[in-house]
Design a protein with these regions (language model features):
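Aromatic "clamp/platform" in nucleotide-sugar-dependent glycosyltransferases that forms part
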Residues: 312
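Acceptor-binding helix/loop patch of EC 2.4 sugar-transfer enzymes
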Residues: 51-62, 112-151, 192, 196-201, ...
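Conserved acidic donor-binding segment of nucleotide-sugar-dependent glycosyltransferases
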Residues: 344-345, 349-356, 365-371
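Nucleotide-activated donor-binding/catalytic signature segment of Leloir-type glycosyltransferases, i.e.
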Residues: 257, 261-291, 295
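A charged, aromatic-enriched C-terminal amphipathic alpha-helix characteristic of glycosyltransferases
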Residues: 70, 358, 371-403
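Carbohydrate-associated surface elements
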Residues: 169, 188
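Conserved donor-binding/catalytic core segment of Leloir-type glycosyltransferases
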Residues: 205-228, 234-239, 249-252
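Short hydrophobic beta-strand element within catalytic cores of glycosyltransferases
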Residues: 329-332
Length: 411
């Protein structure tokens, strides 16, 4: 069957699914933004979208929808040309709803089945908004702003035939009337690559090598920011380093903002928070390595003695489950997305998000007594194998789901 993937940064969440469906003989095509330079084994067509400046005062709560629907219009116009000029009609469209690209595709191809990747539905209460009072002052206006950001996300599913979310908690953020059409299948992790390796090493900039057995504490995120607990982790470090004089801390992540706002007058949170604790740190043992190639990330998870992962009630990072697959002892925040995967004392450890002293104590314990937590590391690996194995569990389920939406074979 013909399958059209739609994602402004393709392959995105379809990195493994699209090639797998192509390998199974399906005619796969992707529609993506003209600025997207990522490689793809699936043929790609590009639409041109020039974002217009939006008058916030005039649009008020409609600003987000204006921006997203504008992209939806650009995408739909490209889709219409694809239909008119090449007579292209997909059987299934699988698109991410986050940027509005799927909003009008049913107007171009009403006969196609539309599957929407439903990653997260913003809420004024009970999720990320208002969670961290240090950076978010609760107000009714804030609640309405958050609700206003959901307009394109809800509309995307209203016009869709089905939805897909990676976790139960993320699916639960959607209203009940929409939640019923969403199936939960995680993207999965490659457990054959992310596996324990006692021979692994990680090179530091000064030429030193970190090895399995070394006292290595790790923290990984796309960008270093409050949404992922960077401020809490950094505030916990002085006590950890004082208690563990041999510990080395490796921090992976960029100095931009993926979620929320940047500090006033600055591009990111890295130095803003670091400067708060710098005088209390042995900075020679804290290694900011920026964004690293995937092979280096894998090696780092393999040498990690303790891996800290914190998140607001928000989208769960793949990296947490990848760390578990590599056999790391993950110390995670006691927030709903993490609790869906980690049970305290079973396959990892949990700490209240805001309890800096508890983070210091638990991470110090994890560094000091690795043998005590070896059973947790083994069960973390089992969790990845039994629930999140991409090749054996997640990808087959996703393939089956997509294929179930296509034309049924004649009996």
């Amino acid at each position: 069957m013909k399958i059209l993937f739609v994602h402004q940064n393709f392959p995105g969440q379809f990195l493994h699914l699209a090639p797998e469906l192509k390998a199974r003989g399906h005619d796969c095509l992707a529609l993506t933004d003209a600025t997207n330079k990522r490689a793809s084994v699936v043929p790609v067509l590009k639409y041109k979208h020039e974002a217009q400046t939006v008058d916030a005062a005039a649009c008020r709560l409609g600003r987000n929808y204006t921006q997203m629907s504008d992209r939806g219009v650009s995408c739909a116009r490209a889709a219409l040309q694809l239909r008119l000029q090449q007579n292209y009609v997909p059987d299934v469209i699988f698109g991410h709803s986050g940027w509005g690209e799927t909003l009008f595709l049913k107007e171009v191809w009403p006969e196609a089945k539309l599957l929407v990747y439903a990653e997260f539905y913003y809420k004024g209460r009970g999720a990320d908004v208002g969670f961290d009072l240090e950076f978010s002052k609760p107000s009714f206006d804030q609640v309405m702003v958050a609700q206003g950001r959901t307009t394109h996300l809800g509309q995307a599913l209203v016009h869709a035939d089905a939805g897909l979310s990676p976790t139960e908690w993320q699916a639960s953020t959607y209203p009940a009337s929409i939640r019923a059409m969403i199936k939960v299948i995680h993207d999965g992790v490659d457990t054959a690559v992310l596996l324990p390796n006692h021979a692994a090493t990680f090179d530091l900039a000064d030429g030193r090598k970190l090895r399995t057995g070394d006292e290595v504490l790790t923290f990984v995120n796309r960008n270093l920011e409050p949404y992922r607990g960077y401020h809490i982790f950094m505030r916990a470090l002085p006590a950890i380093l004082a208690a563990r004089p041999q510990a080395q801390v490796v921090i992976v992540g960029g100095d931009e903002v993926s979620y929320g706002a940047a500090p006033k007058g600055e591009k990111g949170w890295k130095d803003h928070i670091l400067n708060e604790v710098r005088d209390k740190l042995d900075v020679a043992r804290v290694h900011f390595v920026g964004k690293v190639p995937y092979a280096q990330f894998v090696a780092l998870m393999q040498v990690s003695r303790a891996h800290a992962y914190l998140t607001y009630p928000f989208v769960l990072s793949w990296s947490m489950i990848e760390a578990m697959s590599a056999g790391a002892h993950v110390v995670g925040s006691r927030t709903a997305p993490v609790q869906e995967v980690i049970t305290d004392g079973e396959n990892g450890s949990l700490v209240d998000f805001f309890d800096v002293a508890a983070w210091s104590a638990k991470l110090t314990e994890a560094l000091a007594e690795p043998e005590k937590f070896q059973p947790l590391r083994a069960r973390a690996r089992e969790t990845a194998l039994n629930r999140y194995d991409m090749r054996k569990i997640c990808l087959p389920k996703m393939v089956e789901y997509v294929e179930s939406l296509g034309p049924k074979a004649a009996v």
